[in-house]
Amino acid sequence: MPGRAARRRISSPAVSRRLALAALAGLAVLVVLAGLALPAPEAAAARPGCDPIDPAHCLLPWPNDHFRKNGRIALRDSQMPRNKDGRPVRAADYNRSDGFSPGQMIVTRVPGLDLKRSRAVPVDDLARSFAKRAPIVVIDARTGERQLIWAELDAQATNPRKRALLVHPAANWREGHRYVVALRNLKDRRGRTLQPDRAFRRLRDGERSTERYRDIFGRLAKAGIRRRTLYRAWDFTIASRRSLSQRLLSIRDRAFAELGDTTTGDLQVQGGAPAFTVDGVSQLTPDVKRVDGTFTVPCFLDAPGCPPGARFRLDRGGLPVRTPGNVQVERFICLVPDGAANGRPLLFGHGLLGGAEAVLDLAPLAAISNFVTCATDWSGMSSEDLPNVLDLSRDISKFPSLADRLQQGFVNFMFLGRLMIHPDGFASRPEFAGKIDTRRLFFAGASQGGVLGGALTAVAPDFERSALIVPAMNFSLLLARSTQFGRFADVLYPSYPDQIERQLLVSMVQMLWDRGEANGYAWHMTRDPYPGTPRHTVLLHEAFGDHQVANVATEVEARVIGARLRTPALDPGRSRDRRPYYRIPRIRSLPYSGNAMVVFDIGPLRTGGLGTPASPLANIAQTRGTDPHSITATAPAAAIQFSEFLKLGGTLIDTCSGRPCYAAGWAGPP
């Protein structure tokens, strides 16, 4: 213990000041040392090549032309998200694209943001995209036209400090177009205006200038957006049609050329039929026979037989290289009604990670509507692919194997379809002879079969009419909103624990997934057909409140393909939206021969758990009530619609007596 003299010396003002200064100096040293040991979040954006305007992650804001150079995506492995083992996602596959996805989800981080106080456009009021003072705006850089969008905070994130702002296109971005994003006058929960980070503030206020940002600010000014109001702004460019489709169109054309058909798209069967075998026939029901067999398809992946996990090997032009003689032998299952005479050939696509056996559920429809219905596995997303899907959820660098095998799967489906209408195909066998009308093929796909079936429809040479049942597009939009996502999130989320990176990853992989699902081909599904491809007409069937395939994604697809809505779609008050089905035009009269969307409803939540509420506004799945996903398509009114649409000269007819279309025993409000 110090004596009284010592205590007096310590308590003197001069000594106290010296001790205080020493303590502060020591504290400063500790802070510096701590900073060296644990970098602040802003350090991520300070790495070489990062965009400093969003310090939450090197690649934010995303998508972003900061990461596009000389007309190509230009990412580095060092910038990419890392899994729990420290392995970065490999950038090479992304760098083969000349732009971002047509459905690319915008991801950025805005600390303290309150979307309601900011009056940002929500998913249930899309018209606010065009409000004069909208705080979140996306414009076409060339025309200045506002884009239809909605904004949300990531409800999947449990850490508020890692909660990303997500902005979705409510009608896809156009191929090859450049867009500018503007965040302005953003508010916190107390209504205070948020201030930008230093890096963007310097650009905005003219302390630092680049040619790119002079152009961005100029285009925003022409669109009526004042520079001084900006919190953050940047640009991004969408991939071209060629970048999105050239691989699939190349393997399609080369595969059919091997059959001797070099003029696909004229709806004329030319050349030979694919090789096939019939391995078994059984009586499935009193009215329908089951026929099992195999067929052979050229394999364009890098392993013999095109197994799960195999990938394209690309040449210098970016096209898949085929190993001479490599083939895939795929199975098929067909349903042949016993009483069929010239039955309509219907190609069917199964649901999530399922298999060809799903076609067996269509036996009643086949018998009643005289459909000869055939299915195969969706290579890339079938039950056989499940181990690969789980494996790539642990290491996203393996994701190209899924997207590449999906494209091989489309060729498989097209070859099965050709067998159904070729005179030397199934019609040459006694199991099918006289029972199949080879004039024209039709397609129906349910759930995943509707998502992948949209892409197939866009490139298919042998059918013109397609029914997509509880479909959508853009897996990056669908995943978090689906009850099916949980089993994959249980693998993905522990592998990528950073909650900001999860949404970034989901958005990023859409660039690869585009080549294997409808999102990458949607602008050509019903109009502006690809070379060697006929024009297609599509019927979309939406189950209101779907727990597995989010209605918002189905409605984005409807806007892109130009589908008109059959009305009345719902009873008054059933939708959560201020203006339901905004910017989806209505069908004026029935019958209707064009692209259409029909909504089926099992009714609101009621006693016994029957019915379902409208989908949640947030990016989470609906778990209350009964899931209508697998119910509505079996409604007699739906089956009759499909049958009348999927025929030569087919149309959408009114099977709902001028009321909303109901299912599962729901007959409408009293």
Feature map (PLM): residue ranges:
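Domain-level recognition of soluble alpha/beta enzyme cores
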Residues: 263-339, 344-345
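Primarily recognizes the serine-hydrolase "nucleophile elbow" in alpha/beta-hydrolase
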Residues: 419-480
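A conserved hydrophobic secondary-structure block that centers on an alpha-helix together
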Residues: 159-184, 188-189, 325-363
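Acidic, low-complexity Ser/Thr/Gly/Pro-rich repeat segments typical of extracellular/periplasmic
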Residues: 45-279, 286-298, 305
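Bacterial N-terminal signal peptides that target proteins for export
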Residues: 3-26
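Cap/lid segment of the alpha/beta-hydrolase catalytic domain
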Residues: 303-330, 341-432
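Bacterial N-terminal signal peptides
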Residues: 22-37
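C-terminal subdomain of alpha/beta-hydrolase-fold enzymes, centered on the catalytic histidine
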Residues: 405-408, 467-670
